[in-house]
Structures are given as structure tokens and as C-alpha cells.
Design a protein with these regions (language model features):
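N-terminal export signals
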Residues: 6-23
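C-terminal catalytic histidine-bearing segment of alpha/beta-hydrolase fold enzymes
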Residues: 239-250, 258-310
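Conserved acidic catalytic loop of the alpha/beta-hydrolase fold
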Residues: 160-180
Length: 310
């Protein structure tokens, strides 16, 4: 179920923060969790391979999904949260070159408890110095399930981003068209690999995608990531990983090598067109978003993206 306290707190905070006028820097940071119409869940469609319905269990009037890792999860508890986190750092200027950072969380997560508080994603984006806004949808709520839901459907993520642009426009006072035109950096942690792979495979917002950052996330779909890298040589791709996703990253490296594409093992000095880096780490998986090959890896990597200083 949605974290209603977080939603209410966010809405009250938004109302209290002064919006930026056209071409003005935001005087205070804004972070809010709001319901979206184009959210990943609820999802009443089929599994992506077409083998059957996503909701494959019924009992006492309830519908549920059988997760390979978590067993049966019920729609009303796990797959009904329409929440999306929208965050705008202090000093954001919609009149300057800017990017949208989209963050896909991992298993067992909720937006406020994990993305905001534990993993400090909002704080890392702000501390990066990037003139960026953050968008993070809720997937399966607090569950061992990596399902992408509606993001499996071609074109759905593009619709989600249109709604995000409208929400960001309301928060900042800038026009939605500005956010609709901004380049996108896609970040996925752990189980966020599945929706990330779906977005890349479907080609949603492909013309706006500056690059991809994966944080211990290649548990499957290595072929999709490698194919995307090969077909988008003007974008960047960085995957930092520990032991849990080492085999998936090794598969990406092998697939790239077979196509004559070199993947660096060193942290990139800059994130730019053609950057491909696979960075190993012995850091623990559960804290990987805050400590990987170095502390606060998302902050550090976003800080390597030039041309979008706040």
C-alpha cells in the first residue's frame, strides 16, 4: 500500500516551498511522493513472454502474483501502489541545461524508507552539483520481485515520463515542455534491472537517453544491456557491481568484446558519449547505493557528467 504519511508530508512540503519563476533558480529543495496515473502498478496484463497472466492466483476475492523468489504476493498489498518520488534540488535552474535522473529501486523497497532515507538517492543527486531533477517510481512494494509491470508495455514508460514532466512543472513553475525535452539518465539498483532492461528494449525515450548507470544490478538481461551499448555508441554505460551480479557483468563484457567494444575497468574521469565502464567492488549488496567502489557512488558518477552544472 502507498506510504500515505510520506505522500501527505510531501504534498504539505511542496505547498510550503516557493516555486521558481520562469528562468529563476529554485530557492529551496522540493521532495514529494505523489500518485501517478501511469504508474508501473497496478498491472493486469500478461507476463512479458506471453506465457500467462501476471496475476495468476485468486483466493477469497483477491488476486495475486507468484514471484519466483518471494512466493505469492497479493495485488492489494504489493502491486497497488501508484506512488512516484519527485525531487528538485535547491538551486535547480530550469533555464539552464538540465537532466532528469530516473531511479529504479531494488527488491524489498519503498520510496521513503529506502530510496530517500536509507540509500540517500535524493541527497546524492543534490550533492552531485548536477542541474537535475529526480524521478523514482514505486514498483512491487516491499517485495522480493523485480517485475516491471506496465513498463513491460512498449510506449508506457514514455507516457510515464510525460506525466512526470507535468508533475515537475507544477513543482517548479517551469513549463512541462522543458522537462519533456530534457535528456534522461537511467539509474537502476539490484532488481531495478528488469524495468531498466524493458525500457531499453522497448526504445522508450531513446532519443533523450544520455546514458545508463547500474548499481549491482545485472542479474539477468545481460544481452539486452550489451545490445543497447552496441547500438548507442553516443551514450554512456556504467555498471558498478559486487559478487552478486558479477556473472551478469562478465557476460556483458564478453558480448561487448565479441563486437570489438572495449569496456574499461577503471572509474571514468568523465561520463561522455561512448563511455563504457564495468567497475568491480567487494562492497556489500544491501548498502551498494551508498558504498560501492567508493562512497556515495551515484553522487560521484553524476558529478562526472559535464555540461549540466547547477
Amino acid at each position: 500500500m502507498p506510504d500515505r504519511r510520506a505522500i501527505v508530508t510531501g504534498l504539505l512540503a511542496t505547498a510550503a516551498f516557493p516555486m521558481a519563476s520562469q528562468g529563476a533558480r529554485l530557492r529551496k529543495a522540493i521532495s514529494t511522493i505523489v500518485p501517478f496515473k501511469t504508474s508501473p502498478f497496478p498491472y493486469r496484463g500478461k507476463l512479458p513472454d506471453g506465457s500467462g497472466p501476471f496475476l495468476d492466483v485468486t483466493a477469497n476475492g483477491r488476486r495475486g502474483h507468484t514471484s519466483p523468489r518471494g512466493g505469492i504476493y497479493w495485488e492489494d498489498e504489493t502491486y497497488s501502489d501508484r506512488s512516484t518520488l519527485l525531487a528538485v534540488p535547491r538551486g535547480f535552474d530550469p533555464a539552464r541545461p538540465a537532466v532528469i535522473v530516473v531511479f529504479f529501486h531494488g527488491n524489498g523497497a519503498t520510496l521513503q524508507r529506502d530510496v530517500v532515507d536509507r540509500q540517500r538517492v535524493v541527497a546524492q543527486v543534490e550533492a552531485s552539483g548536477l542541474n537535475a531533477v529526480l524521478v523514482a517510481p514505486q514498483f512491487a512494494s516491499n517485495a522480493q520481485d523485480s517485475s516491471a509491470g506496465n513498463f513491460w508495455t512498449p510506449g508506457y514508460f514514455a507516457r510515464f515520463m510525460t506525466e512526470a514532466a507535468q508533475g515537475l512543472a507544477k513543482l517548479t513553475g517551469a513549463k512541462a515542455a522543458k522537462f519533456d525535452a530534457m535528456p534522461v539518465v537511467l539509474v537502476a539498483y539490484s532488481g531495478g534491472y528488469n524495468p531498466a532492461a524493458s525500457v531499453l528494449r522497448n526504445g522508450d525515450v531513446s532519443g533523450r537517453l544520455l546514458g545508463v548507470i547500474l548499481l549491482d544490478a545485472v542479474f539477468d538481461e545481460a544481452d539486452i544491456f550489451a545490445d543497447w551499448i552496441a547500438r548507442h555508441r553516443k551514450s554512456f554505460f556504467v555498471s558498478a557491481y559486487g559478487q552478486p551480479s558479477a556473472s551478469g557483468n562478465a557476460e556483458i563484457r564478453q558480448l561487448l568484446t565479441s563486437q570489438g567494444i572495449d569496456a574499461s575497468s577503471d572509474p571514468p574521469r568523465r561520463l561522455e558519449a561512448g563511455t563504457v565502464a564495468l567497475l568491480t567492488s567487494d562492497a556489500a549488496h544491501d548498502s551498494f547505493v551508498t558504498r560501492a567502489f567508493l562512497g556515495n557512488p551515484l553522487q560521484w558518477l553524476l558529478g562526472r557528467l559535464h555540461g549540466f552544472a547547477r
